[in-house]
Amino acid sequence: MVKKEAIIKAVNGLHVRPASTFVKKAKEYSSEITIESDGKSVSGKSLFRLQTLELSSGKKLLICAEGEDEEIAASELAELIESFKE
């Protein structure tokens, strides 16, 4: 399992539009993707579950990937989270 930390830089947090982009990208990987924040852990491949984390601007989260492409998945998804600006 590979874990990468990311900080939400988007002014409006991880609202529906960037969250759906994240989920779409996460589904491209064969690895299991899990997002952890504030002691909660949810599937990174579920928009509904991701929204339950209430990921606001400045919040730290942990992207966990387990599977064949775990290293690239965790790295690219962490970069994606930090690339969102709105």
UniProtKB/Swiss-Prot annotation:
Residues of the signal peptide: none
Short name of any one Pfam family annotated for the protein: PTS-HPr
Chain ranges of the HPr domain: 1-86
Gene3D superfamilies named among the record's database cross-references: HPr-like
GO CC term (a single one): cytoplasm
Cross-referenced InterPro entries: HPr, HPr-like, HPr-like_sf, PTS_HPr_His_P_site, PTS_HPr_Ser_P_site
GO biological process: phosphoenolpyruvate-dependent sugar phosphotransferase system
Catalytic residue list: 15 (pros-phosphohistidine intermediate)
Highest rank taxon of the organism: Bacteria
Residue ranges that the Swiss-Prot or TrEMBL entry lists as coiled coil: none
Alphabetical keyword list: Cytoplasm, Phosphotransferase system, Sugar transport, Transport
Record's subcellular location: Cytoplasm
Protein role: General (non sugar-specific) component of the phosphoenolpyruvate-dependent sugar phosphotransferase system (sugar PTS). This major carbohydrate active-transport system catalyzes the phosphorylation of incoming sugar substrates concomitantly with their translocation across the cell membrane. The phosphoryl group from phosphoenolpyruvate (PEP) is transferred to the phosphoryl carrier protein HPr by enzyme I. Phospho-HPr then transfers it to the PTS EIIA domain.
Family indicated by similarity: Belongs to the HPr family.
The protein's name in its UniProt record: Phosphocarrier protein HPr
Lineage of origin: Bacteria, Pseudomonadati, Spirochaetota, Spirochaetia, Spirochaetales
